[in-house]
C-alpha cells in the first residue's frame, strides 16, 4: 500500500514538473542584423511558453523587427545586461526563467531537457553546454579550432555562464534578488549565489554560440574568457573588468522601462 502511494506521489510530482511554464528572456542591444533569424529559430523550439525580448535602447531597427513577431513581447529599458534580464524576469509569467543571449541558439529539445532536469526538487537551475560556431566571414581557417576552447569551460566548470542559456526556477531567482546590475560578470556572480541555493545541473546538450566576438578580437577574447573570471574571483570589480574589455554591451540611449506585448 505504501509503495503504491509513493509511486502515485512520484508520478504526480513528475507530471507537475513537466507542466512547468518556461519564459525565455533575451536581452538585446542593436541586434537588427540577427534578431529576426534568432526569433524565427526560437519559435520553432517546442515547449517554450513565453518569449520576452528586453531591448536596452537600440538605435537600429531591432525594436521594429521584434514588434513584427506577434508571439513575442518587447520590453524596453535602460542598457545593461543584468538590468535588462531583471526587467524581463519581473514581467515573466512562467515558473522557469530561461536567459538566452541574442547570439545563442537552443537545440530543438531544449524545453524538454529543462523540464526533465527540474523533476528533481533539489535542482534550482542549470545550463547547457556550448558549441561555438564561426560566422560566415571567418578570416582565417586556423581560428576555427580555437573557438572551441571556450566550450571546455561549459563542460567542466561547476558554475554556468550566461552564454550557456542559464535557466532557474522563478521563485528561486526572485528569492536571490535576481542579477546584480553591474557592468560585467553578472552571470558568474549570480551562479555563485545560485549554487548556494541548491543543485545546479549541466544539460548534456549544446547550445550554438556565435563566434562573432571571438572573430572580432580573437586573442583578446581568449584572454578575457580565461582571465577575467579568475580576476573577478580574486576581487577585481565588474566595472573595472568592463573598462578593460571595452564594455561592448553598453550604448544607445537610456530609456524608462516599458513593455509592449504583441
Segments predicted by a language model, with ranges:
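Conserved donor NDP-sugar-binding/catalytic core segment of glycosyltransferases
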Residues: 109-140
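Hydrophobic helical membrane-anchoring modules
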Residues: 3-5, 9-17, 192-262
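Acidic donor-binding/catalytic loop of UDP-sugar-dependent glycosyltransferases
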Residues: 61, 102-116, 192
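Short, well-formed alpha-helical segments that are part of the catalytic scaffolds
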Residues: 30-44
Amino acid at each position: 500500500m505504501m509503495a503504491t502511494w509513493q509511486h502515485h506521489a512520484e508520478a504526480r510530482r513528475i507530471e507537475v514538473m513537466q507542466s512547468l511554464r518556461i519564459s525565455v528572456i533575451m536581452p538585446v542591444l542593436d541586434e537588427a542584423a540577427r534578431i529576426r533569424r534568432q526569433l524565427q529559430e526560437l519559435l520553432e523550439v517546442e515547449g517554450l511558453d513565453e518569449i520576452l525580448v528586453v531591448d536596452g535602447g537600440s538605435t537600429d531597427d531591432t525594436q521594429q523587427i521584434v514588434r513584427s513577431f506577434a508571439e513575442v513581447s518587447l520590453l524596453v529599458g535602460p542598457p545593461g545586461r543584468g538590468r535588462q534580464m531583471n526587467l524581463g524576469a519581473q514581467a515573466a509569467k512562467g515558473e522557469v526563467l530561461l536567459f538566452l543571449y541574442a547570439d545563442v541558439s537552443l537545440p530543438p529539445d531544449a524545453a524538454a531537457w529543462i523540464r526533465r532536469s527540474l523533476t528533481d526538487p533539489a535542482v534550482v537551475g542549470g545550463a547547457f553546454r556550448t558549441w561555438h560556431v564561426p560566422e560566415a566571414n571567418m578570416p582565417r581557417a586556423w581560428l576555427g579550432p580555437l573557438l572551441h576552447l571556450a566550450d571546455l569551460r561549459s563542460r567542466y566548470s561547476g558554475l554556468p555562464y550566461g552564454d550557456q542559456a542559464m535557466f532557474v526556477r522563478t521563485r528561486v531567482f526572485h528569492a536571490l534578488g535576481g542579477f546584480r546590475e553591474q557592468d560585467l560578470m553578472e552571470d558568474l556572480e549570480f551562479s555563485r549565489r545560485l549554487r548556494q541555493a541548491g543543485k545546479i545541473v549541466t544539460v548534456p546538450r549544446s547550445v550554438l554560440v556565435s563566434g562573432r566576438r571571438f572573430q572580432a578580437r580573437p586573442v583578446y577574447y581568449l584572454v578575457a574568457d580565461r582571465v577575467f573570471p579568475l580576476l573577478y574571483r580574486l576581487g577585481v570589480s565588474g566595472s573595472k573588468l568592463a573598462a578593460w574589455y571595452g564594455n561592448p554591451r553598453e550604448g544607445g540611449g537610456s530609456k524608462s522601462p516599458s513593455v509592449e506585448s504583441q
